[in-house]
């Protein structure tokens, strides 16, 4: 019975957080970015690429971030080279590109895999219902958007071609919790 009590104690100490807030990842400068600091904020996670037909969305993403960041909204960019090698640069090159061409100030993370067997754990969470309790999904292209509520749960998955400043997204940012 002592063994049973010990195993119950150990299992109760294991994190059962099934929100985005459980993650710590490297940002584009190599520093740790702790998603638990986003509790109480709405979050858009978007996989990005510098040489894509949708790269122009950086401009809309930055405008959206500038306009709504004071309303507890944040955009997190995850560069990825998973779609036709459209993000070949290093983290430094990606950041320079984003700053010089689009004035990006929203948080950018280190380049990761968003699909396949080496998919980053945060994208495993975003795409697997067993981890996110919302739905299974696939990242279909660069600039797919995941809208995360203040509790760290996925509420919407937005197609890559949908502009960041679309009515659907703006309405989600500005309405309710």
Name what the model sees in each region.
Residues 38-43:
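Proline/glycine-enriched tight loop/beta-turn segments at coil->beta junctions
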Residues 27, 47-51:
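Amphipathic alpha-helical repeat scaffolds
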Residues 54-120:
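Structural microenvironment flanking redox-active thiols in thiol-disulfide oxidoreductases
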Residues 13-36, 56, 121:
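N-terminal "domain-start" segment that seeds a small globular fold
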Residues 121-124, 129-177:
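Thiol-/selenol-based redox modules, centered on thioredoxin-like
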Residues 1-17:
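Bacterial Sec-dependent N-terminal signal peptides
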């Amino acid at each position: 019975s002592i063994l049973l009590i010990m195993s119950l104690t150990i299992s109760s100490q294991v994190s059962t957080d099934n929100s985005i807030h459980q993650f710590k990842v490297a940002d584009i400068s190599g520093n740790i970015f702790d998603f638990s600091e986003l509790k109480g904020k709405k979050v858009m996670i978007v996989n990005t690429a510098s040489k894509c037909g949708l790269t122009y969305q950086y401009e809309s993403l930055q405008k959206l971030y500038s306009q709504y960041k004071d309303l507890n909204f944040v955009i997190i960019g995850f560069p990825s080279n998973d779609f036709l090698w459209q993000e070949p640069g290093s983290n430094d090159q990606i950041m320079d590109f984003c700053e010089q061409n689009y004035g990006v100030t929203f948080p950018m993370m280190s380049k990761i895999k968003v699909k396949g067997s080496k998919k980053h754990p945060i994208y495993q969470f975003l795409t697997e219902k067993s981890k996110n309790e919302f739905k299974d999904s696939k990242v279909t292209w660069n600039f797919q958007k995941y809208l995360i509520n203040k509790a760290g749960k996925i509420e919407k998955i937005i197609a890559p071609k949908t502009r960041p400043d679309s009515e659907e997204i703006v309405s989600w940012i500005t309405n309710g919790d």
